[in-house]
């Protein structure tokens, strides 16, 4: 028991002396049950040369054992024999730590960061781990910032006697190995030896361990800095590309927060345009020569060799934009470098790193945006075509603030404004979608009703059109569908003059007779010029390229001027449309007959007089909408509202709707010839046209008044009044709006007809 206590006291006092020598504390007292080992008097190193020569072989062997401290494993029974060995008196005074210089340049080697065998397990904490040690007599002193570099105890001072009561090992530091298992393991060669270390050996061991510890600290910090830099670079990439956040979970004490990161500027983007797209510029030798001094590649580019014509040609794999790292810097106080030189070199390295990485990052971003410029939204491409945008400067951040409702070169909208506008746009799109759906359904219903009405029309034709019941059905059908082209001419002819052709045979000059007169007469040149001016004014200036002017139009107008009725208002327009309509099959005889028939029945002098009188003064319905409305105060006169301005409206109608309008006007001027007393046998030379017109021709001026009222109330745009409508020089102006799409054209036309029917019922 006494031997065990004596050994424990010996180990405790040896550790106390070691602490005292490293912390500049002397004259420490040992435990009451042990004896202390006093340090020799202070001597110069030259006094110990002869004395230490005899111990050279033993010291060299112990020195090698200390270097290979972590590479040997032995039984734990050697600890006791190492502690009970003879202690050689100290005969050499160690030099101060301030004069210790780095003996191996590998300490700051650039490869130390990436050495796979190096780890942070050698970073340890030499705190008080022995619960049985008596340290009450040691004077405490605050540790300075060089704590890890200067606090090195003797190997013996950290040992414990295995035969004594075991003391629990200190709690290991997370991420590092337990120093207790390293230096108190049974395989420790120093604990295995029978002779204790001299103070000189302890000093050499202290230097070895200091270098090893410093190397491990630098490697660990550099490795942590490299890993954290990769995380920061990843965060920069994600923020620019995907707007994602990367959390950095590393030790904050191992990061250098003042290292500038690479950035992409507009100027560098514009100035970084290069023609070398196949091989990166940093691979070329000319570019490599311009690299800043001191920078090196964290991971060199990967090269492979391909065989071309028997030669090996290197092919390069592009590097990362951040594939640049700082060189290792000297440690002030350890390396032989002044503080000014250290700060100057570090500043140059940081500046070079920033410029180099920024240039590479700009080139990478420029190449990426050049490849993806074709995938940008259409508004950016249109702005680029107009010189208002550079596609290389469009980033994800700018795209997030750009909307289709505002050009990209204007200031961006406020987020609340964007949200409000998107909501309104969504509502309008919903309304348009519903409207389009309803219109499509309506067009499908129109196609179906058109087939049904054709069957009904064929039924009343077989039964007889001039019956009252047939005329009633026909007036219902005509507001839904126009007459078919193959039936239009026959229906018009039977409704206006019955199947006996009472008017054309008795009151209209035949086409052949007028043509014979024209062929035997030299037509006056002045009259021909007047007709040509009429065509230019009322036809050519109104329709543009919709319908070509036929050569037969001038010929038919010349014939009409030679007839008894002569040229009247609307002749040129009726001839022009009938020549191209499929219903007449390009028959000039039918065109001649039908134009004269319509002018004698639907647009005769009696209808004209009624229209001019009722539109200004007489009709109550027209006066209710127009006469009492202050907006039409300047138009409610005979100059703007007359029979001539009615044809100004018809001149602006498209061909299809013009024929449908004539269908409606003609059918509403029909009469029942079946119950009429007049017949082919009753007509003789004594019954003049005036007598026949008074007794047998229906004059429906109300259909014309309702038509004019519709234009004034619903389509009065693009002109000031109806008299100025003929002077409008826009050839594309049409009432209603013309469209080349069949569905749209039917929609506009059917809407116009429904509104006309609504106002006609008011009369």
From Swiss-Prot:
Bias type Low complexity, positions: 18-36
Entry's Gene Ontology BP terms: fungal-type cell wall organization; protein transport
Keywords tagged on the record: Cell wall biogenesis/degradation, Golgi apparatus, Protein transport, Transport
Subcellular location per the Swiss-Prot or TrEMBL entry: Golgi apparatus
Annotated stretches, region: Disordered: 18-48
InterPro entries the record matches: Sbe2/Sbe22_C, SBE2/SBE22_M, SBE2/SBE22_N
One Pfam entry name: SBE2_M
Cellular component, GO, one term: Golgi apparatus
Role played: With SBE22, is involved in cell wall integrity and polarity processes like bud growth.
Protein name: Protein SBE2
């Amino acid at each position: 028991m006494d031997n065990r206590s004596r050994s424990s006291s010996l180990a405790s006092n040896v550790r106390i002396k070691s602490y005292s020598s490293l912390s500049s504390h002397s004259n420490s007292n040992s435990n009451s049950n042990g004896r202390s080992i006093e340090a020799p008097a202070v001597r110069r190193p030259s006094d110990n040369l002869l004395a230490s020569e005899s111990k050279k072989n033993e010291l060299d062997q112990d020195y090698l054992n200390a270097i290979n401290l972590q590479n040997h494993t032995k039984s734990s029974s050697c600890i006791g024999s190492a502690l009970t060995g003879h202690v050689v008196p100290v005969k050499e005074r160690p030099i101060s730590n301030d004069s210790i210089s780095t003996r191996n340049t590998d300490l700051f080697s650039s490869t130390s960061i990436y050495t796979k065998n190096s780890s942070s397990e050698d970073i340890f904490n030499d705190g008080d781990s022995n619960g049985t040690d008596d340290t009450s007599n040691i004077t405490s002193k605050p540790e300075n910032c060089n704590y890890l570099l200067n606090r090195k105890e003797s190997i013996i001072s950290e040992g414990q006697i295995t035969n004594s009561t075991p003391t629990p090992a200190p709690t290991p530091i997370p991420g590092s190995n337990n120093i207790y298992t390293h230096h108190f393991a049974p395989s420790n060669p120093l604990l295995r030896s029978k002779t204790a270390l001299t103070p000189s050996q302890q000093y050499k061991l202290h230097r070895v361990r200091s270098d090893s510890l410093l190397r491990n600290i630098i490697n660990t910090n550099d490795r942590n800095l490299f890993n954290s830099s990769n995380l920061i670079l990843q965060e920069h990439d994600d923020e620019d590309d995907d707007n994602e956040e990367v959390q950095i979970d590393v030790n904050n004490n191992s990061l250098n927060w003042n290292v500038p990161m690479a950035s992409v500027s507009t100027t560098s983007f514009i100035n970084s345009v290069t023609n070398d797209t196949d091989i990166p510029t940093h691979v070329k030798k000319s570019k490599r020569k311009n690299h800043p001094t001191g920078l090196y590649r964290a991971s060199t580019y990967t090269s492979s060799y391909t065989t071309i014509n028997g030669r090996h040609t290197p092919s390069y794999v592009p590097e990362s934009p951040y594939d640049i790292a700082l060189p290792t810097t000297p440690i002030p106080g350890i390396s032989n470098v002044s503080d000014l030189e250290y700060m100057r070199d570090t500043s140059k390295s940081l500046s070079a790193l920033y410029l180099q990485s920024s240039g590479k990052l700009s080139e990478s971003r420029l190449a990426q945006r050049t490849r993806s410029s074709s995938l940008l939204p259409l508004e950016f491409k249109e702005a680029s075509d107009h010189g208002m945008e550079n596609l290389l400067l469009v980033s994800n951040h700018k795209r997030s603030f750009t909307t289709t409702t505002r050009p990209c070169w204007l200031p961006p909208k406020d987020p609340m404004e964007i949200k409000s506008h998107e909501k309104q746009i969504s509502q309008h799109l919903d309304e348009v979608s519903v409207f389009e759906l309803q219109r499509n359904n309506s067009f499908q219903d129109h196609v179906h009703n058109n087939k049904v009405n054709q069957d009904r029309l064929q039924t009343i034709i077989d039964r007889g059109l001039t019956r009252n019941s047939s005329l009633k059905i026909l007036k219902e059908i005509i507001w839904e569908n126009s007459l078919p082209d193959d039936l239009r001419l026959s229906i018009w002819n039977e409704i206006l003059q019955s199947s006996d052709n009472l008017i054309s045979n008795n009151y209209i000059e035949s086409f052949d007779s007028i043509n014979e007169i024209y062929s035997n007469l030299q037509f006056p040149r002045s009259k021909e010029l007047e007709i040509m001016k009429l065509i230019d004014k009322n036809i050519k200036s109104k329709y543009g390229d919709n319908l070509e002017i036929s050569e037969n139009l001038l010929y038919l107008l010349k014939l009409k001027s030679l007839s008894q009725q002569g040229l009247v208002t609307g002749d040129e327009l009726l001839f022009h449309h009938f020549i191209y309509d499929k219903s007449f099959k390009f028959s000039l005889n039918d065109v001649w007959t039908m134009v004269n028939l319509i002018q004698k029945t639907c647009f005769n002098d009696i209808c004209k007089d009624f229209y001019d009188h009722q539109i200004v003064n007489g009709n109550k319905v027209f006066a209710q909408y127009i006469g009492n409305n202050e907006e039409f105060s300047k138009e409610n006169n005979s100059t703007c509202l007359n029979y001539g301005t009615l044809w100004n409206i018809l001149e602006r109608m498209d061909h299809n709707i013009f024929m449908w309008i004539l269908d409606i006007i003609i059918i509403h001027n029909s009469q029942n010839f079946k119950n009429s007393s007049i017949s082919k046998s009753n007509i003789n030379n004594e019954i003049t046209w005036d007598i026949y017109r008074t007794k047998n021709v229906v004059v429906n001026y109300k259909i014309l008044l309702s038509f004019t009222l519709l234009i004034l109330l619903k389509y009065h745009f693009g002109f000031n009044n109806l008299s100025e409508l003929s002077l409008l020089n826009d050839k594309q102006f049409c009432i209603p709006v013309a469209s080349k799409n069949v569905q749209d054209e039917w929609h506009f036309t059917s809407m116009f007809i429904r509104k006309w029917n609504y106002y006609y019922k008011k009369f």
